[in-house]
Amino acid sequence: MDNRYPIGQFNCPSEVQEKDIQMWIKEITTLPSRLHALTVSLDELELTKTYRENSWNVRQLIHHISDSHLNGYMRMKLALTEDNPVVKTYEESEWAKLIDYELPIRVSLQLLESLHERWTYLLKNLTATQLQRTYQYPDGSIMRIEQSIALYAWHGNHHLAHIQQALIRTK
């Protein structure tokens, strides 16, 4: 197993079924509680553990998930209100060096809980037409909202697995 991708790399589905969307929305919905359950009792030393050499630590992973999912939510809202908008990318590794990544993880866990409540309410109420709306990355690649739902469900599970790996590595 490649510990960079403990659940495998993301494979963007070309065709999406309604049952897939419902499963991904459920994963997005439950991510904050799954993260909270896994990390609520961690001490400072455990928060500094990494899942592999030179990787982000548990604290950085939690703050990153919050940042990334905030961006994902905004990308979807842009796609719903504009015609195939070009979305901005960001330097994730540089964001992880900013001072707010030193905050207690409860700050990002609270943000994720509120964000995911709004996000999943939106997702559960999208029409079939809205699920087909798109946004575009600066490189020209296009993502449908239904594919983006798959991406962020995978993303949350991907980093949850990283945190699990880091905590196993600490024992």
UniProtKB/Swiss-Prot annotation:
EC number: 3.-.-.-
Cofactor info, note text: Binds 1 zinc ion per subunit.
Entry's Gene Ontology cellular component terms: cytoplasm
Keyword Cytoplasm (UniProt): yes
InterPro entries registered for this protein in UniProt: DinB-like, DinB/YfiT-like, Put_metal_dep_hydrolase_YfiT
Record function comment: Possible metal-dependent hydrolase.
Family statement: Belongs to the metal hydrolase YfiT family.
Name of protein: Putative metal-dependent hydrolase BH0277
